[in-house]
Amino acid sequence: MAVGKEIKTQIASIKSTQKITSAMQLVAASKMRKAQQRMAAGRPYADRIRSVISHIATANPEYRHLYLQEREAKRVGYIVVSTDRGLCGGLNVNAFREMMRSMKEWRDKGAEVDLCAVGQKAISFFRNYGGNVVAALSHLGDDPSLTKIVGSVKVMLDAYAEGKIDRLYLVHNRFVNTMTQKPTVAQLLPLPPAEDDEMIRRHWDYIYEPDAKGLLDGLLTRFIESQVYQAVVENNACEQAARMIAMKSATDNAGGIINELELAYNKARQAAITQEISEIVSGAAAV
């Protein structure tokens, strides 16, 4: 029964793959929980810095930092965060599609575009696509550190300070829940006005050391770095969630295929037995 042997070989192969996808699902679930914890731990820090920047800028209107000044956009920069590995559904493709939509809007207005690609998938995609990648960073791992990110962010901040770019956007996937990851394009520079009602209603008269200007300069740079770091951490949580869902789907699909093959094997075996019985009966009748 040659057909039956082939089917059994297929079943064994798919069961082996199913074990791998099931294990990957469990690993992704564990990594996702850790990434969610890092994501939750980083949010209060970024929110507090943003609040302090708003207070200082409001209390010192005579000093307008370069990062707060609006200017005509002739060249636009993007920091795009992706994954290093695949097997995470359409996570990267959705973010790239959203970013290319934004890029097209600026190019239609006559603006040029520079890119900082974080993650191997973004690097490969935009270099093949023809984007002007001026900075690249990959292999940050499942527990990225801020020190590894700072260098690439500085390239874009220096470009903004020198007038080489006039807008800076951050593109990444936002973690909504385990089933939903939303691609987001957020403006980093110039820093959008804060939507803090309490800050608008009240005024705090702080004393700054050494001075408000020096403090604001340092906080703005640190805020941009923290935003990119938070995006990398959040994108990692999205990656693990998407991979967990993709591997669960693959495991379930493998189970369905195995059931179909086992049914086909049983039918082939039944047909072979029926044929053997028919041959025996025919032989006995001939005798």
UniProtKB/Swiss-Prot annotation:
Entry's transmembrane regions: none
Keyword Nucleotide-binding: no
Record membrane topology: Peripheral membrane protein
Alphabetic keyword roster: ATP synthesis, Cell inner membrane, Cell membrane, CF(1), Hydrogen ion transport, Ion transport, Membrane, Transport
HAMAP family with a match to the protein in the record: ATP_synth_gamma_bact
Function recorded in the entry: Produces ATP from ADP in the presence of a proton gradient across the membrane. The gamma chain is believed to be important in regulating ATPase activity and the flow of protons through the CF(0) complex.
Assembly behavior: F-type ATPases have 2 components, CF(1) - the catalytic core - and CF(0) - the membrane proton channel. CF(1) has five subunits: alpha(3), beta(3), gamma(1), delta(1), epsilon(1). CF(0) has three main subunits: a, b and c.
Protein name: ATP synthase gamma chain
Gene: atpG
